[in-house]
Amino acid sequence: MNILFISLGCDKNLVDSEVMLGILAKDGHQMVDDETMADVIIINTCCFIHDAKEESIQNILEMADMKKTGRLKALIVTGCLAQRYKEEIIQEIPEVDAVLGTTSYEEIAHVIDGVLSDSPMERGDVRLTMKDVDYLPVTDTHRMVTTGGHFAYLKIAEGCDKHCTYCIIPKVRGDFRSVPMEHLLEEAQNLADGGVKELILVAQETTMYGTDLYGEKRLPQLLRALCKISGLRWIRILYCYPEEITDELIQVIKEEPKICHYLDLPIQHASDGILKRMGRRTSRAQLIETIEKLRREIPDIALRTTLITGFPGETQEQHEELMDFVDQMEFDRLGVFTYSPEEDTPAASMPDQIPEEVKEERQAELMELQQDIVFDQAEDRIGEELLVMIEGKVADENAYVGRTYRDAPNVDGLIFVNTSEELMSGDFAKVKVTGAADYDLIGELL
């Protein structure tokens, strides 16, 4: 069968998509990019915030229209939206032939067989394919990498135990479950054997890896084992909760040359009052202490964070506290979301909800401040010599685009490398920074 696969949402969802693609390829199916050529369309959805939910629904409705042309035989919906709104999707969008939960994606080949069956009973059996939300699928480690082949994500855990008051993730992804280390090492080896040079560790919270399986945090041990895999040049860590960062983890990052001096710290806010309302397990003082320790121990570390502005009850004074914190900390990378009320979360029913226009004003103020910080940092980089991973060629120019260790794919900046030499995606090149443009750098090949 010709299958069109649409993957929405975060990098963790993308890993699930790649696992499903690997299963389908092994089962003999062909992947296509054109919906008019597809016999089956699979949509892996997201519902983390309102905009993500709307994007998922719009994609489902657009693909449902394809069934009217006659070629499309089946439409399958999986992922977080499917887990959260399974009954509503079945009832309100009859064009959807099957709904798979977040822990059922390993059943994708069986579900396709079912929806294409001539038997009404078999079609009915797979219409709603759900396993316990705390089940941990551990499948064949041969994924179909969709990120270009030179970098890939490694999902080291599923679910979350934090239960922040604004977040729906524990309801749709279950409690925190670590993937066994031996499985991760096998998967990483397969990725390296396939040409992957940068491995990016993801989970809802990477810093808690191992606590459920081994009774202790095992991220440092996992990192040391991954560093022994030949072929890997960079290992990057995302989604590190600041309060869970240990001295042992910092030491591993310092000692292992393959580990990028880069951490993603999703702090969300810096006012103690808002942190408490969010259900976060840290304070402004603790955040400052952790950030200062990281910079003291690893002076060239790049720190990325994400913030939520306009949380229920956020006063102008608390917003200014956050502005002051951002100004003081000078993060290398920063993203700001406006608070999105999600049904079935405590924050959605909290008093003092903030008007949308106020949220957007505060978001703009934070991003304007961060822009000034990043522009100053970029100017300071001019003259530096950096190792760059090449992502691809700039069309019709003697230039390439790449990333430094300070830049995670899709969320951070880029560096444009001027050269007439022939380079390939995944190549590493030494580049001298000669200029800056907004969030990006410009350089020349050395």
Task: State where each predicted segment sits.
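Conserved SAM/AdoMet-binding glycine-rich loop
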Residues: 75-77, 84, 193-319, 327
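Short glycine-enriched, charge-decorated loop/helix-capping segments at active-site entrances
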Residues: 47-48, 173-174, 213-216, 276-282, ...
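Terminal RNA-binding accessory module
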Residues: 349-446
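Generic beta-strand/beta-sheet core signal
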Residues: 6, 202-204, 238-240, 266-268, ...
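Conserved, mostly hydrophobic/aromatic
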Residues: 164, 184, 201, 237, ...
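Proteins enriched for Cys/Gly/acidic motifs involved in redox and nucleic-acid/cofactor modification
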Residues: 1-209, 248, 259, 263, ...
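Conserved beta-strand core positions
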Residues: 3, 40-41, 152, 199, ...
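Extended hydrophobic-aromatic, low-complexity segments
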Residues: 261-262, 275-276, 287, 299-302, ...
